[in-house]
């Protein structure tokens, strides 16, 4: 990142309140937000809400457009609408839930190269014997009763951070700690920062980062069905080295001239992807689909789990009222591949809207 490379940096102040409300369901007078789960304001959140918010065009917006207020009142849904989105997230990463040296090094490299990593800790331990208030050091070894319930950010690390800094009742075996930034003000920890042992049982369970983003919005429309993001996984086996194909049919939103410039996908494993487009209608046969040249060439490979954007070398004009986008996926296992979907589940995903005849998967390239 720019700070690490001693380059000019820019500080952004995005609206937490907008994310809180834009990812919630019920507004004033019982009005429902159609593009989210059943989550309500004040009920907490996690990456399953935050990452789709940043990748589906809902946000982020500047703090000045919807400033923080210390309340959870019902508001008019108009308060979250027609805001100026000021950031676009292209690629994210989900790290392994592992305390291996390899995974720790991957996280360190991400912090050094791209910036902070979102993680979870057991927040209640701040008032428990897992925390040393004099040093701001946290080490939890209770995997059964002290689970993740609070989100923080890894902003650095200290391989030599001594075990003597931790509460004497619960100390890790080895030195070393992540430096985390909390959201509880400067009076907690060391001016708002804390040290979490590399051996903490929660620190690797929910780890996510942003790989590529921009403060320039270079699109007018996003075509999508999965506003709530990836919440389920399917697997196709017996492939014997063959890829699978995912396709969506979209209806053009305007009567004006539009071009497709990029396609997004969530990878559940290592993928190599190729993109095909039919800009002339809803046909999905091989003869209908045109191979797209990407900025990376004929294909693009992703090694890490997460949301990814495949950028076109040249824009493709939409010539009909409907069009098709298809992605060919080759997974890391030659015999099977998993892929993510947005599913209608009980509880928070019970109201997810699923449209029939719009999304397809096949192993035969729609022949």
Regions found by a protein language model. Give the residues of each.
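Alpha-helical support elements that line or immediately flank enzyme active sites
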Residues: 1-8
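Predominantly the structural core of cysteine protease catalytic domains
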Residues: 2, 13, 18-177, 181, ...
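Short, intrinsically disordered low-complexity segments
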Residues: 38, 78, 292-294, 335, ...
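Short, surface-exposed secondary-structure junctions/capping segments
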Residues: 204-216, 309-312, 355-365
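Low-complexity, Pro/Ser/Thr- and charge-rich linker/hinge segments at domain boundaries
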Residues: 220-224, 346-367
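Aromatic- and Gly/Pro-enriched, solvent-exposed loop/edge beta-strand patches characteristic
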Residues: 270-355
């Amino acid at each position: 990142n720019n700070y690490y490379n001693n380059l000019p940096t820019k500080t952004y102040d995005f609206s937490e309140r907008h994310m809180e409300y834009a990812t919630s369901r019920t507004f004033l007078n019982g009005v429902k937000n159609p593009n989210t789960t059943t989550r309500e304001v004040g009920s907490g959140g996690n990456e399953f809400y935050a990452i789709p918010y940043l990748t589906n065009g809902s946000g982020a917006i500047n703090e000045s457009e919807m400033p923080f207020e210390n309340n959870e009142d019902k508001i008019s849904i108009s308060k979250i609408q027609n805001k100026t989105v000021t950031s676009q997230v292209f690629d994210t990463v989900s790290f392994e839930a592992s305390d291996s040296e390899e995974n720790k090094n991957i996280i360190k490299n991400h912090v050094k190269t791209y910036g902070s990593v979102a993680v979870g800790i057991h927040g209640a331990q701040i008032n428990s014997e897992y925390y040393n208030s004099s040093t701001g050091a946290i080490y939890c070894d209770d995997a059964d009763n002290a689970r993740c319930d609070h989100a923080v950010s890894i902003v650095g690390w200290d391989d030599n951070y001594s075990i003597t800094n931790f509460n004497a009742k619960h100390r890790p075996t080895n030195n070393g700690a992540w430096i985390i930034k909390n959201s509880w003000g400067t009076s907690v920890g060391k001016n708002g920062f804390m040290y979490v042992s590399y051996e903490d049982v929660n620190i690797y369970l929910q780890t996510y980062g942003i790989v590529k983003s921009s403060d320039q919005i270079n699109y007018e429309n996003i075509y999508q069905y999965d506003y709530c993001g990836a919440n389920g996984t399917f697997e196709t086996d017996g492939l014997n080295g063959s890829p699978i194909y995912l396709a969506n049919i979209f209806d053009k939103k305007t009567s004006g001239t539009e071009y497709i410039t990029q396609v997004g996908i969530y990878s559940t494993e290592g993928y190599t992807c190729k993109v095909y487009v039919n800009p002339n209608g809803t046909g999905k046969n091989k003869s209908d689909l045109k191979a797209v040249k990407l900025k990376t060439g004929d294909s693009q490979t992703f090694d890490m789990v997460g949301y990814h954007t495949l950028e076109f070398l040249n824009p493709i004009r939409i010539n009909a009222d409907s069009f098709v986008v298809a992605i060919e996926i080759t997974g890391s296992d030659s015999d099977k591949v998993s892929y993510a979907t947005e599913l209608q589940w009980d509880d928070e995903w019970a109201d997810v809207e699923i449209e029939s005849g719009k999304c397809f998967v096949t192993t035969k390239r729609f022949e």
